[in-house]
Amino acid sequence: MNYLPPFENNFWTYLLIGACVFALIQLVYVFNFYLRLAYRRKSNDPQVSSFPPVSVIIAARNESDNLYENLPTILSQDYPEYEVIVVNNQSIDDSNWILTAFAQQFTQLKVVEISKSPHLKPGKKLPITLGIKAAKYEHLLLTDADCLPNSNQWIKQMMQQIKASQQLVIGYSPFIQTKGFLNKLIRFDNTWLSASAFAYALANFPFKANGRNLAYTRTLFQKVNGFKSHYAISPGDDDLLLQDAIKYSAVATGLSP
């Protein structure tokens, strides 16, 4: 009969206990963060009888096709008072012609032109800053030219989330479903990342925002000095701004794209 030393004899017991502890930690993690989404109350407050005026800001560069397809839906929102500011960032396509035509049809559309220059930094930070300067309202809602709201209630659903203590709202922005495995993979990754962002935000640990659907106030933008702390970095008009903003405001979530 072979003799097993005490440690080797108990190895599998220790391993099983370790696996159970690890599984328990994972369950606590899931319950503490991700289940917050399942029990999040949808904000459809019947007492909201009036909505603040809103400036929708879109930074666009060579987006003529997307502007032609998506801008009419944004300009036809069911919202009492809002303007749409498109910052045409050095475009060399037909964007100027399309925006001019839409501006004649929709009085709430304002166009800001940025002339082409080799000295301008890439990215959306300058266009967004110029759009905010041109905006006449306190509440700002940002999206991209290649994004299409799923209904004419988009602005209302985002503005329902803003409160005095929550001056920034991170919104959901799913990818459109098309054929192919790659699209499935992209949509899964985006959904998982969005769920993580919302779950952590609901737990008061926000770490990610998406510039395709993001709202905040002009006051908050000015408090963090805009993009000054990270202007040298091309990306970050959403995530890095969020990290500055949470020093001054709590974060709300808007799950309706």
Give the ranges of each region predicted by the language model.
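N-terminal membrane-anchoring/stem segments of glycan-assembly enzymes
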Residues: 1-49, 184-187
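Long helical/loop segments within the catalytic core of UDP-sugar-dependent glycosyltransferases
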Residues: 33, 110-127, 131-133, 157-224, ...
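Short, well-formed alpha-helical segments that are part of the catalytic scaffolds
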Residues: 39-42, 63-76
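Cell-envelope/extracellular polymer assembly enzymes that use nucleotide-activated donors
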Residues: 52-55, 83
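Acidic donor-binding segment of Leloir-type glycosyltransferases
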Residues: 71-118
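Short beta-strand-to-loop acidic/aromatic patch adjacent to the donor-nucleotide binding site
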Residues: 137-148
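Catalytic donor-sugar/metal-binding loop of nucleotide-sugar-dependent glycosyltransferases
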Residues: 219, 239-256
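Donor nucleotide-sugar recognition loop
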Residues: 222, 226-241
